[in-house]
């Protein structure tokens, strides 16, 4: 990727407009998961170290454009940053479109960009106002790189300099390493509830990976495609022909045993059985021990591992063993030299639950952007940075 990088630029005295991803869950004014803020702090520290005048902004929630509501304010993020080890004061500015004073040794958080009229439609006039605030635009929000909005795309067209922040640069490098030039054997694990939302991903990965592993509702379709009864399990029957086509082009191991329950609840009893024994009133909520161990064996022999989605309903204690075995196998393979990359909300939750965050080579912060990159789609925010780097 030929883009300018913030880390390579002279930032002394320069006004920086950093578009970060600070879209964190907030409940009653309190942040319930700080992962995205923690990921952004090194970028802010680097900007301060390099003597920049730092402005940072993000979207948060889904506000109505032109309407300010406290529920969508970045104030909780400001409070978090002030309590962190940044070592400089952090202040929130709500009205900034006509200019904002920013000094070295402080951070100015510009209020939620989605409150500004024209943000989502990439209005050129709004983009020019953003660009006028800065000397350098830093795109560091990979999670929104697939959206051409004012704060992710438009500003990059008009800012004097447009570059990638450390997070975005690392993300593109890690994804490139896993997908463009993977060490082989390359393994892709795709789980989750709906196969229709991940069909293009499966299709793209089937052309790159030496082996595909499917889990969750996606695996149920492959089980059904082999002629087994999946009972009341979540699956999309109309996609069975597609599953058969994929299975004919790539080796996809189908579970031989599963854990079933008769209700979708935390207290449901888990029964382990062969896939051929699932009854009409049962639902598959996890893979069985034999299947999990077989998959763990495959994982441990891989040199590149791409992981998106759990293999069972790991949120329920009775149905998390499969995902736990898979998670630990990925951690072990990584410890033995494999390059592993993981992404997607459920995957990150599983990584946290099983305490393996420091045992995965790279954890992607982008959900939709992560999958669109895998599908081979052009990410608008990256495309404009490349264009500006070469103009």
Curated annotation (Swiss-Prot):
Q: Where in the cell is it found?
A: Cytoplasm
Annotated GO molecular function terms are: ADP binding; ATP binding; phosphoglycerate kinase activity
| Involved pathway(s) | Carbohydrate degradation; glycolysis; pyruvate from D-glyceraldehyde 3-phosphate: step 2/5
Q: What is the E.C. number?
A: 2.7.2.3
Q: Which InterPro entries match?
A: Phosphoglycerate_kinase, Phosphoglycerate_kinase_N, Phosphoglycerate_kinase_sf
Q: Which organism is it from?
A: Haemophilus ducreyi (strain 35000HP / ATCC 700724)
Protein keywords: ATP-binding, Cytoplasm, Glycolysis, Kinase, Nucleotide-binding, Transferase
Give any single GO term for biological process: glycolytic process
Which reaction is the catalytic activity of this chain?
(2R)-3-phosphoglycerate + ATP = (2R)-3-phospho-glyceroyl phosphate + ADP
GO (cellular component) term, any one = cytosol
Q: Where does substrate bind?
A: 21-23, 36, 59-62, 114, 147
**Which HAMAP family does the record cross-reference, listed alphabetically?**
Phosphoglyc_kinase (MF_00145)
Q: Where does ATP bind?
A: 198, 315, 344-347
State what protein this is by name. Answer: Phosphoglycerate kinase
Assembly information from the UniProt record: Monomer.
**PANTHER family (alphabetical):** PHOSPHOGLYCERATE KINASE, PHOSPHOGLYCERATE KINASE 1, CHLOROPLASTIC-RELATED
Which family is annotated? Belongs to the phosphoglycerate kinase family.
